[in-house]
Amino acid sequence: MSQKFANTGSFIEREDLGKPNKGVDRVQKGFTAAYPTQSSIPYRHRRSVIPESEKRGFNSQARRFYSKKDDIPGPGFYNVIHQSLVFNSVSLSKRGTCTFPSTCARLGPIISKYPAANAYTIRSELASKKDFSNSCSSMFQLPTFIKVVKSETPAPNHYNASISICKQRNNVCARAGFLSKTPRGFVPSSEPGGPAPGHYDVNESLVRESPKVLVSCFKSKTGRGLKPTSTGPGPGYYNPNDQTKILRKSHLPKTTLLNFSAQPLPLPEKPPLPGPGQYEIVNYQGPPKHFISTASFVSNTSRWPVKSSKPTLPGPASYKPEIPGKQSFLYNEDNKWIPAV
């Protein structure tokens, strides 16, 4: 690559020999102000001088970076004063996250260019002679020639205010926002004739102190006492040591009856109720538990042995198969093999 450019540069140098350099004071082609670097491809109107160190065919070192010094300041040549980071602002755009748009107003307050309402006065010639807002309209007014009923409330000087009501009840300055207007004092009954304190009896259940026991809010009202009438036998009604009586059949009379129907039999007596020792209680624990898998898709096929309805079928160990042994054969005169006994 370097050898090719070296040969090309030497060819351009020979072609431009003896010609005056016309573009000494002008900007050469391939040179820009933004990127002041040398062009890698030479052209005809440019005189390129290749040093002897780069004319070698191999191991040539070409210049890849521009080392010309200029007056442009570098990145750290000047100081920029940045504002402090915003941490307490509601707007996320001020923090630099740019996830949500800022809620701050982008425009300042709009100041009206027109005068205010009280900044000027209207001349009397321009004002309307009749103001409809001050005129009386019969549409929204009461009839004028109807007698108005006076208020029945007393006048300020028709009653005497009680001083005790006007005084402050307590020294608390705070008052409730929704103060009740119900009087808390004693109100005498307007209907006399009620019973005196000794003319009636007070229910003692209302006066007694309730037991200090936790009581449910939904307390049952069912009575827990014994019923006065019981249909069952009492504790001493039966004897557990006595044996139960065996009912015997009643004998029919041997006298002949002249009826077409048989004589009615008496009703059997009711057997006595069993006592505490006439039956045995067995500790029944229920059917045996089988460990069954609790998978979401359990097979419905039974995994336990089921008694067969056909008892004639043999079981797994009811017979014993025997493997036949080896047999020997004899070759007879008819050229046939006969098993030997």
From Swiss-Prot:
Modified-residue entries (Phosphotyrosine), positions: 78
Residue windows of the STPGR repeats: 73-80, 115-123, 154-160, 194-213, 232-254, 273-284, 313-323
Keywords annotated in UniProt: Apoptosis, Cytoplasm, Nucleus, Phosphoprotein, Repeat
Annotated stretches, region: Disordered: 1-23
Gene Ontology terms describing biological process: positive regulation of apoptotic process; positive regulation of mitochondrial membrane permeability involved in apoptotic process
Keyword Cytoplasm: yes
Residue stretches spanning the membrane: none
PANTHER family per the UniProt record, alphabetical: PROTEIN STPG4 (PTHR35678:SF1)
The name this protein goes by in its record: O(6)-methylguanine-induced apoptosis 2
Gene field: Stpg1
